[in-house]
Amino acid sequence: MTTRYIFVTGGVVSSLGKGIAAASLAAILEARGLNVTIMKLDPYINVDPGTMSPTQHGEVFVTEDGAETDLDLGHYERFIRTKMNRRNNFTTGRIYEEVLRKERRGDYLGATIQVIPHITNAIKEKVLAGGEGHDVAIVEIGGTVGDIESLPFLESIRQLGVELGRDRTLFMHLTLVPFLGAAGEVKTKPTQHSVKELRSIGIAPDVLVCRGDRAIPANEKAKISLFCNVEERAVISLKDVDSIYKIPALLKAQGLDQLVTKRFGIDCKEADLAEWEKVVYQEANPVGEVTIGMVGKYIELPDAYKSVNEALKHAGLFNRVSVNIKYIDSQNVEAKGDEVLQGLDGILVPGGFGERGVEGKIMAAQFARENNLPYFGICLGMQVALIEFARHVAGLEGAHSTEFDKNTPHPVVGLITEWINEDGQVEERHEESDLGGTMRLGAQLCHLEEGTKAAAAYKSTTCVERHRHRYEVNNNYKERLEKAGLIFSGLSSDRSLVEMIELPNHPWFVAGQFHPEFTSTPRDGQPLFEGFVAAAYTYQKRDLED
């Protein structure tokens, strides 16, 4: 199979939406019957985002094979059916680490290691490997043209453009075309300068995607075409929209997919975007709404919970309701108590690390349990629910996780020292293990107990979900917690680790050690999120009736 490559760069400012644009183009090409994948090349020096602060970088998206990756890979999986893996995201740090390891082994036979050719060759090898087996590989380059960190990646794709030829490569550049209110017109000069910067390093863009708060007039498109040496039909206007799921239709309406397939000489069917039209319609026409309180510690940057936010919206689509997310700092719960939890239709406690705010999360779980308010716990959200139950129902005073209190009299949650990974191999950890890349990661099989809400949601006695954690339920307390009424509704593949808990006689008090948000998509949803939002809507209607 001959793979074609589309390289996506950005200019003028960061956060233009390269990832969304790349994913939307991929969705159209997939709708035309092509096998598409997307890669993200990140210019930072970290080996991966696994140990980066969520308030700086946003969430860490976990792939099926256990790679800790950029949140853009979540966008990719939500737009196309292809599952991402560790080949779909790599950083400058990863490249340098691998090149230096080869140098230490003597693989370069004493050569002087340089950015060109050694670093650029390593980048090209990864790009080509990531595209294998696909008709089209879209490669997004992180950062902005002109950033010093991006230069090795830009040089690498420039070389690939020469080596693979024009019939296998296409360069798509996103720029900003701002509207100046004082002048009453859009300004193309930033785009011209950005393209000039890109051309100065040897890359001539084939397509310009121009971002702005409004559609670009035809005369301005012609101006951009003239000054940037790009065909007028290849100047694409991408205005702000109220839903990212409208973007595939916007790009298709301007013929971007036809431009790509013609360039690559690919003969394929027309794109059918009926699934996306359905998503947009459902999003615009809810029959009700619910308010979900998300109790966390990284709420100053909602992107820290990007996949959770999107999964709640997807669940809203399947329940025909609009989901309003109220972000609640768990430290505010500690300071103000129940007053910050009023007026909610459900509480969700997402994953997280560290002691700060953990008692507020425990208080939120207690409030939901005692008031029959739908509760959904994810990863740490399951652990705090179990700690709360142990303290206040099972009578285990002072129960805690050893992550937060190593001297707790009842360590109901502790460090996992051994488990079976996705390949069936035994993995071991201890207190002194590195923080990076040492968690239980990736897709794991979970056995669900019949008759539980978990099994009912999945309509199955098994599920496969992705993990990212190093602490687990202490099995020494299982019997006592079960006697107090807690149901262990999900167990690991070898039934040695607790994966899910729930409460009987409660509208919805369900929690999982895994991260189901990573498998939610707007077209398919996710069973647990759908069940949670349905329970929240039912709770709201009953509350109004009362």
Curated annotation (Swiss-Prot):
Mg(2+) binds at residues 72, 140. Pfam families: CTP_synth_N, GATase. The keyword rRNA-binding does not apply. GO terms for cellular component: cytosol. Keywords: ATP-binding, Glutamine amidotransferase, Ligase, Magnesium, Metal-binding, Nucleotide-binding, Pyrimidine biosynthesis. SUPFAM superfamilies: Class I glutamine amidotransferase-like (SSF52317), P-loop containing nucleoside triphosphate hydrolases (SSF52540). ATP binds at residues 15-20, 72, 239-241. PROSITE patterns: GATASE_TYPE_1 (PS51273). Residues 1-266 are annotated as: Amidoligase domain. Allosterically activated by GTP, when glutamine is the substrate; GTP has no effect on the reaction when ammonia is the substrate. The allosteric effector GTP functions by stabilizing the protein conformation that binds the tetrahedral intermediate(s) formed during glutamine hydrolysis. Inhibited by the product CTP, via allosteric rather than competitive inhibition. It catalyses: UTP + L-glutamine + ATP + H2O = CTP + L-glutamate + ADP + phosphate + 2 H(+); L-glutamine + H2O = L-glutamate + NH4(+); UTP + NH4(+) + ATP = CTP + ADP + phosphate + 2 H(+). It comes from the Bacteria. The active site is at 379 (nucleophile), 515, 517. Pathway: Pyrimidine metabolism; CTP biosynthesis via de novo pathway; CTP from UDP: step 2/2. GO terms for molecular function: ATP binding; CTP synthase activity; glutaminase activity; identical protein binding; metal ion binding. L-glutamine binds at residues 352, 380-383, 403, 470. UTP binds at residues 14, 187-192, 223. Its EC number is 6.3.4.2. Residues 291-542 form the Glutamine amidotransferase type-1 domain. GO terms for biological process: 'de novo' CTP biosynthetic process; pyrimidine nucleobase biosynthetic process. CTPSs have evolved a hybrid strategy for distinguishing between UTP and CTP. The overlapping regions of the product feedback inhibitory and substrate sites recognize a common feature in both compounds, the triphosphate moiety. To differentiate isosteric substrate and product pyrimidine rings, an additional pocket far from the expected kinase/ligase catalytic site, specifically recognizes the cytosine and ribose portions of the product inhibitor. Homotetramer. PANTHER family: CTP SYNTHASE (PTHR11550), CTP SYNTHASE-RELATED (PTHR11550:SF0). Belongs to the CTP synthase family. Catalyzes the ATP-dependent amination of UTP to CTP with either L-glutamine or ammonia as the source of nitrogen. Regulates intracellular CTP levels through interactions with the four ribonucleotide triphosphates. This is CTP synthase.
